[in-house]
UniProtKB/Swiss-Prot annotation:
Its EC number(s): 3.6.5.3
Chain positions recorded as Mg(2+) binding sites: T26
One GO MF term attached to the UniProt entry: translation elongation factor activity
Chain positions recorded as GTP binding sites: 19-26, 81-85, 136-139
Sequence ranges assigned to domain tr-type G in this UniProt record: 10-207
Segments for region (G2): 60-64
Chain coiled-coil ranges: none
Pfam families xref list: GTP_EFTU, GTP_EFTU_D2, GTP_EFTU_D3
Organism of provenance: Pseudomonas syringae pv. syringae (strain B728a)
InterPro entries in the record: EF-Tu_GTP-bd, EF-Tu_GTPase, EFTu-like_2, EFTU_2, G_TR_CS, P-loop_NTPase, Small_GTP-bd, T_Tr_GTP-bd_dom
Compartments it resides in: Cytoplasm
Taxonomic classification: Bacteria, Pseudomonadati, Pseudomonadota, Gammaproteobacteria, Pseudomonadales
Protein name: Elongation factor Tu
Classification via PROSITE patterns: G_TR_1, G_TR_2
Length: 397
């Protein structure tokens, strides 16, 4: 069968299901694909297919994630669902599946549970910008007051972690009913349709990566006689044009330069765009002024920092991580984009040590500055071996 052409006419949005184990995340994921296939003509995916999610690797960490897609009238959605709680933690911290918005699934019969809270906290830490709530299993709750109570609890919990709890859309329904094609009291297919319409209206269209300010991590530096210095790398975001002023940020003092040429596959171009591997020719920059690990950016868009708070996941022994816990003052290397920088960790109050397999908030101080922003992902390494992953939650200095 020939591969279908990817439809670029609809804007593309990344979402995912989060919430406590057995509250119905995977059932809702399957129901979304079913309802959208009937209403908007995308393909349905069976529950079992999603539940036996394949393994994938992100930053040296194995994660089980199921990716499905569905369409609404106005958008194409890529949706990620994880089978286990540990997979969620790893997924969100490594950014393996970046989400423009999350669907928090909470059982109306049980109300918020420990992982409900933890997933909301993680969403805040890793910068998931929007959450929509689906109160699931509402067909099992006869008491309208109980539904109201659970709704209030969920709103309070969202507000606790700085999400707009009072204004968050909450859809009440039954994913199982929708998956079976039923719709008693509009709790099945109607509720799931309403959820899709809510995703359309509540989660804004993400800024396209080419519209963001230019940033390219420097992987290599060459000097070409008679032409000057060329830095190569994969453009992370934005566009660079010939004659653009640029800054080189990180590891040393920030320097200013100008792009005098863009090269890809030995051809000269007028511009380089996000996602492309290219060489950027720099005017007035010496070969020794630049090194791998710095970034080339639009002036003023990114600053170098050495101190930050991060949410980290520490690999378990089985995943090839450490065999022993670490304590405050732990000094591994932090691998940002293209280079390692040594840093020391302070643990939160009341936390004596961090065990392999844990996730925890730490404060990090690096020995050299790195170009960083909230949401930047990194790996934690010891002598080149990955022992953890993290995300910058808040810059301190």
């Amino acid at each position: 069968m020939a591969k279908e052409k990817f439809d670029r006419s609809l804007p593309h949005v990344n979402v995912g299901t989060i919430g406590h184990v057995d509250h119905g995340k995977t059932t809702l994921t399957a129901a979304l694909t079913r309802v959208c296939s009937e209403v908007f003509g995308s393909a349905a995916v069976e529950f079992d297919k999603i539940d036996s999610a394949p393994e994938e690797k992100a930053r040296g960490i194995t994660i089980n994630t199921a990716h499905v897609e569905y369409k609404s009238l106005i958008r194409h959605y890529a949706h990620v669902d994880c089978p286990g709680h540990a997979d969620y933690v790893k997924n969100m911290i490594t950014g393996a599946a970046q989400m423009d918005g999350a669907i928090l699934v909470c059982s109306a019969a049980d109300g918020p549970m420990p992982q409900t809270r933890e997933h909301i906290l993680l969403s805040r830490q890793v910068g998931v910008p929007y959450i929509v709530v689906f109160l699931n299993k509402a067909d099992l709750v006869d008491d309208a007051e109980l539904l109201e109570l659970v709704e209030m609890e969920v709103r309070d919990l969202l507000s606790t972690y700085d999400f707009p709890g009072d204004d968050t859309p909450i859809i009440i329904g039954s994913a199982r009913m929708a998956l079976e094609g039923k719709d008693d009291n509009e709790m099945g297919t109607t509720a799931v349709r309403k959820l899709v319409e809510t995703l359309d209206s509540y989660i804004p269209e993400p800024v396209r990566v080419t519209d963001k300010p230019f940033l390219m991590p420097i992987e290599d530096v060459f000097s070409i006689s008679g032409r000057g210095t060329v830095v190569t790398g994969r453009i992370e975001r934005g566009i660079v044009k010939v004659q653009d002023p640029l800054e080189i940020v990180g590891l040393r003092d920030t320097t200013v330069t100008t792009c005098t040429g863009v090269e890809m596959f030995r051809k000269l171009l007028d511009e380089g765009r996000a996602g492309e591997n290219c060489g950027v020719l720099l005017r007035g920059t010496k070969r020794d002024d630049v090194e791998r690990g710095q970034v080339l950016v639009k002036p003023g868009s990114v600053k170098p920092h050495t101190q930050f708070e991060a949410e980290i996941y520490v690999l378990s022994k089985e995943e090839g991580g450490r065999h022993t816990p670490f304590f405050k003052g732990y000094r591994p290397q932090f691998y940002f984009r293209t280079t390692d920088v040594t840093g020391s960790c302070e643990l939160p109050e009341g936390v004596e040590m961090v065990m392999p397999g844990d996730n925890v908030k730490v404060s990090v101080t690096l020995i050299k500055p790195i170009a960083m922003e909230d949401g930047l992902r990194f790996a934690i390494r010891e002598g080149g071996r990955t022992v953890g992953a993290g995300v910058v939650a808040k810059i301190i200095a």
